Amino acid sequence: VCGTDHHIFQGEAPAEPPVILGHEMAGKVEKTGENVQNIEFGDKVAVNPNIHCGHCYFCQRGEINLCKNLQAIGVTRDGGFAEYVVVPETNVHVFTGDISYEEGAMVEPISCCLHGIDLVKINSGATVAILGGGAIGLILAQLAEMAGAARVYISEPDPRRRKIAKNLGFRDVFSPQEIKEKIFEHTMVGAEVVIEAVGVETTARQSLNLVREGGTVLFFGVCPEDLKIPVSPFDIYKKELTIKGSNINPFVTERALDILTEGKINVNKLVTNRYSLKQLPEILSGEIEDSGLKSVIVFN
């Protein structure tokens, strides 16, 4: 269950009913189409939900995540909150070994985070600040360390999530009220890279106050379309700031699967709740408190 599913259910994200939600998924192949060549019955697969057209200006340039005709399984067409889902062959990725279906369902968020980390080009020894200690924030934090960050700061208001972050081995985990003082106490100048991984006004504003001169701010968290924050062009000019956005996961799903298969990232500690499909409406409506980090829908 992704935060986007909650936003769609509450009418805050662009999806039109009737559509079955669920874009983070893994499962077993039950049937293949007559033209399918590389996928077989019984294969365990993770799904990349994003389907690009291959013909528009951006697709022709290799920028498939910016496709003008982009479709998304679980957003614009029926998704994984069902016993069966139809997926194009090009969007399924076979995994083997000891990878569980729960881990396989995390390939999609890992791949999105991997694209974001690629965009900010973390230098060896860099200081990185992650605003948001949810599942996405903690995936980003692990990938930032893999990319060479010497110190990763995590800002998270929920003490339960801060505890999980520390259990993953991160020492610099603080509340939003503490994070600025702690970063400047260590660096004197601010973080080289700041990643906003929540998608709300307070963290969007704060991100610009934590980055050092010559640094990069990445807006990763999906925010409401009408959210606006004040930005000073003079500060961007004077400090030579780079401000970027990160949108889905072009050409990185296999890399994400490899990282997971090789044990380079821990997602098991991120899954804190397991529910049945029948409980899904209560989760999305808030009747069941979706506490902890990541909730998964388990099919028996």
Predicted regions: what they are:
Residues 10-57, 96-98:
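Glycine-rich beta-strand-centered segment in the early N-terminal region that forms part
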Residues 44, 127, 215-216, 242:
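Short glycine-centered segments of the SAM/dcSAM-binding site in methyltransferase folds
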Residues 53-131:
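NAD(P)H dinucleotide-binding glycine-rich loop of Rossmann-like/cofactor-binding domains
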Residues 99-178:
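Mid-domain Rossmann-like dinucleotide-binding core that forms the NAD(H)/NADP(H) cofactor-binding site
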Residues 157-158, 223, 249:
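Residues in the short beta-alpha loop(s) of Rossmann-like NAD(P)-binding domains
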